[in-house]
Amino acid sequence: MPIKRMWGGRFEEAGDQLVNQFNASISFDQEMAQEDIEGSLAHVKMLKETQILSAEDADKIIAGLKKLRERLTSEGLPFSIDNEDIHMNIEALLTEEIGPVAGKLHTGRSRNDQVATDLHLYVKKRLPIIINELKKLQAELVDKAAENVETIMPGYTHMQHAQPISYGHYLMAYFQMFQRDVERFEFNQQHTDLSPLGAAALAGTTFPIDRQLSAKYLGFAGPYHNSLDAVSDRDFALEFLSNASILMMHLSRLCEELIYWCSYEFGYLELADSYSTGSSIMPQKKNPDMAELIRGKVGRVYGDLFSLLTTMKGLPLAYNKDMQEDKEGLFDAVKTILPSIKIMTGMIATLQVKKEAMEHATHHDFSNATELADYLATKGIPFREAHEIVGELVLKGLKTGTNLVDIPLDEYKKISPKIEEDVYTCLQPKVAVERRNSYGGTGFDQVRQQIKDAKKILEGK
């Protein structure tokens, strides 16, 4: 049932219906119902411990909150727009459950620190879930890389064939991207792991509360050191959205290549049927819709970030109603990135790699040109001169339809008498890849080492 507005004493007129609807946030902040109850439980336990509330009153409130928590889990709670937000809805339901003593719950607390606490708890809970899902994706990338250490494919710059690489090496590049995402979310935990509870409206409270105790009850590392900062800070949410945006950018880049490489023109990969869809008119189609959807959802997460950045940019201290707009984008980002990570994990796990098609693409594309330039440099020809020579040979090959491996040895000897039969060996794509064993390179030994190191990271060593 609706309760009398908690702030209504100063007002003579009832609110306009449209204004009340515009002001209400229960349609979306009910997402934090669990967190709101948890925050209230911690607060009332602290009030009991500090003897601000009697044990009898506190125990009634605690029992009532626990009943609401059980109902929320089992059947849900009946929220009303008349009660404006999740905090007032929970208090209204608590009042129905235990009577007027519920009004004592708000002693030494404001909705300003209450909502900030709820939001901290919401993000704090979800960060380890996201990190865990990212690690599952990384594990699939490592497994797929281990299967494809010696799978040769074209490496690209400017979407043009550049040099042959190991497909395993390519996959490990994404492992590293997602590792940075993991580290960013882990760092995000530090700024999220602070309790605003007890900061009250902005200046603290005259009640002898114990903020360290309520922070401990909620599992926070400690309370904010400044009450103004506690109620006005949304940096932790901005960090989360920034991290989510970078993560989605990484997923989008991977999706872009999956989409290309599953096409008829490339034919390097094939997605499992379970991660593809068909066409209502074209019977032959197998569309990479999941990859396209992930790529498309990047924009909404970017929008969530820029929405909150724009909301916060001009706000004076401390709390402003603008900050009600901090939640929907945050909730949306969480609900977007988690399924995106899970679906990408499944796509990688079930991905069919067409090794022959990949390697075939490296045999007539001149991606071995750098190998020839390096080879000539080892024979004493300055690299810049070698680069010019090979460029001319490539141009000639393009005009005649021949490749560098088709040039007779006597033609090579005209360039330098030091060139031997082994020039043809170095021009083989697999040899070219295998020889690039500088640290972090695409050489097979280096890729195996990257995989070994990655497994240690995933094992926490």
From Swiss-Prot:
GO terms for molecular function: argininosuccinate lyase activity. It is an enzyme of class 4 (lyase). One of its GO terms (biological process) is L-arginine biosynthetic process. Its EC number is 4.3.2.1. Keywords: Amino-acid biosynthesis, Arginine biosynthesis, Cytoplasm, Lyase. Pathway: Amino-acid biosynthesis; L-arginine biosynthesis; L-arginine from L-ornithine and carbamoyl phosphate: step 3/3. Transmembrane segments: none annotated. It is found in: Cytoplasm. HAMAP family: Arg_succ_lyase. Belongs to the lyase 1 family. Argininosuccinate lyase subfamily. This is Argininosuccinate lyase. It comes from Limosilactobacillus reuteri (strain DSM 20016) (Lactobacillus reuteri).
